[in-house]
């Protein structure tokens, strides 16, 4: 919501402006045009220069060749206009129809135009252009825009009498903001990051109240689970689309080429002419080319009952296969052409899901298939020429809501059937041997070259088609007529003249047209059935080679039929993958083991019910402490334990809805919602008093007592599915559509030697690595590449088969909910039994013995405290921890000490330590730390080749994310350590998937980063999931999760930091400039931007800083300080270096200058310095900056930071923000609006 812009009344005496009343006569609706103004005092040239040189980036109009582009921001939009997002990225191509008028946004270009008109004393035009009613409104709009959109405006247009808040949102809106009007979706767009559509095809024609409401609906899509909110799809930078309407009159239209298409005596005649014909024609235009046609002769509107989606992609594939297989496919050719022509418009996947006419695709793919799979030709009868075909393509590309008339459709059939009929070796033109033409102009002397030129210049096509047409254009041969079947007429053919057909060819075309181009899921279904061998990419190539590509004209024998592939094709042809989710009513519920909740279960369930943050006295509060001190209060930026009754009683009583909150493992919620409250300092659930940190009253044990053994059939079925060998498609479909009436114990009946444990691992991981309890298999695109999520290229299809099996075994737990995906219910007995069964398979083995490593270096107190905390939590059943201690606090040594402790105390089947690094740079650091501080570790480097040999009890493997992705190590680790864990934020990356697998199968996990959560919550979400806290990974539980699973220590001994603040002074001139901005009536955000610009860019300020910095360095030198001085930029570093005679890193001297960019991360050779001199940095960078000095090799225990700030300026606000960044629990970024406020107004941060 935009803020109301307020304005102080200017008390200066207003001077009247001479206005010519004649200039005002054209706009009688203006209320206040004759009011006196002070425009004569305005220096418009200066104001225009201000806009030209100091407009903020988002308020600058987008131009091309010095002309404004046709986007909504520049032009606005009228009702029924269509707009499309043409910016590359995840929302590319999404389009809408505008249902309410939108004003053009106020950009630098528009404001300059208004100012130039005012300079000419033209007052009427600005009011008309901006649709304003008075000069007072104009002053308000201009003044407020200049205040907010520029950095050096001098308040010269502040003479308005009152505020007009109804214009505030318009004034502040920029091109990246969502449209605030009703829209109708017209294009589903193409997600260039995933290869899928932006929104589903069935959203077409859906109406939304605004861009924001459409974005909110997008956020609910399965493909956006775990992703940041949609914000930049339906926005003002969308391009206004030209209306592809038919033109009735071209008398005054410029063109270079004019074609006419006529249907005369049952034959289509296309000609390039020089003069416009007088007969009534309709026209479509492409740049310098116009095509005339009689609409009623060639096109007719599609019937309204034709809206049911048809699989046009499948029909187009069938059209191509019909031509490739030759003359005995005439029957299916006719049927296919009829089906395509009758189909509604659809979204073309290979062209970014662009909305296209099915009739256009009919003639376009016919044109391409004839050239690619047959040969160019000249006509000899009533068949269409290549020029006829491409002109029909261009007409239907503009006229989307039409289909071909029956007469013209008959000619299209004849043309396709003639190409199909010409199926000998001599009918396959070898276009591949030709060279691509660089230029492809229209050639009036050659219809053939003209057709190809029109195609290349005006049709969006696949790159392979482009290359083919450019090669074909270079051909200068005399082409032959098509051979014709015998008929009574020498010239005219009908489709009925093509009578050759046989059932085998018909069936072959019907099935081979179902391939990876139109049905990408076929890749995963095929992979599900064959032994583990081919990746999805290899299967894509295989299907093309074995099934799709065969052309009878090659003279080669058709490949033997792959029976597995044929069965999958039959399945896709005849059966829907949708199944009934009705569960067998006779399914048995088992009696349960009444398992007593352990401490972790009790605490977790309580935190789910009571643990979300609330407010008391303006402070953040959590019921996440200890039994003695149950509440945590955020006081002075630090969480403090308390038992204050007033704070505890302030808990807001409320319902907790548990329907979508997963219970602790082994239990289910007894109800879908619970009433929680605190009465007299005691927690109550549904009116019953419970102990602090024991929410087990809301839980019911669901661990089933299963005694029934698995029969031989089911054992054989499970073994087959998990073996990695052949699975019959019929078996997969059978288990998909059936369910066992009861849970059976199946693990002990199968032989581990007969199953592929990698499939078990991947199945186990899929169950945990899901969002909103939806298990997603694939999808992949037609080339076998991933789309929305990371996939296992070798096993993804097998996983689809296995989850169908699990649905059969646990029908109340896993259910198919789409062609590939499955829903998961974790509050069932089946879920508990399934997880325990998989774990029984995975975690088998003998207890580990062997050498135990030791730590040879004494730990700092905070390191020992961290180790003790983690070990205690691990003992209580926790899986993962995050170590967010400061840079230089020794996190590496802490993790090694933890590893040694765990190895010493645990000797079960888990063994070895895996260290995952983001890249190669940290490998040497880890090797050095192990050598310096430990004994008896068996250190192994995971080399790119993969194998690391035997993993012993004391083995520590150092690997990188990339190596783990390419050559994963399958092992049950005792501990996985992920250093710089921000590298596993992207859930769609395969390396993140592998990191998740390693951590899930490990007994324990530690994730390390001093800037652990410096990121958006959607990125944080995946790392929280890896920790497996048992708490909901939702924003309202964020602080609770952190309190439970993050340690953040600052060394309490050893190196100590002393911080001093030196105040530099502004001189009188710069102080006056500063105060002038302070006095402006601006939002604090805009004011901060202007003040910052002054302090950064003003030369007088920069020179003054250099002088005072020189004195500071001289004084510090006398005190024995060796200074590392941080500059904002390279330019500032050079300025300081030249004036202070101090080298810039990597050169070093008694002092050294480094930029924030170069000197924040990774530099380990600066420990010769003991003092940091800098302006207050951002909280994100401070820990890393301090870590350049406070690290091994530093000989000084007393280190210093000398902050220099300009007194009574916004730089003091930076100091206040740093107060909340000394420890991790303080390191949440201050809300930006609050930061601006404290910086500008010097308020104390609360």
From Swiss-Prot:
GO terms for molecular function: ATP binding; DNA binding; helicase activity; hydrolase activity. Residues 872-1030 form the Helicase ATP-binding domain. Keywords: ATP-binding, Helicase, Hydrolase, Nucleotide-binding. Transmembrane segments: none annotated. InterPro entries: Helicase/UvrB_N (IPR006935), Helicase_ATP-bd (IPR014001), P-loop_NTPase (IPR027417), SNF2_RAD54_helicase_repair (IPR050496). ATP binds at residues 885-892. Disulfide bonds: none annotated. It comes from the Viruses. It is an enzyme of class 3 (hydrolase). Residues 1-21 are annotated as: Disordered. Its EC number is 3.6.4.-. It holds the Pfam family ResIII. PANTHER family: DNA EXCISION REPAIR PROTEIN ERCC-6-RELATED, SNF2/RAD54 FAMILY MEMBER. This is Putative helicase L115. It comes from Acanthamoeba polyphaga mimivirus. The lineage of its organism: Viruses, Varidnaviria, Bamfordvirae, Nucleocytoviricota, Megaviricetes.
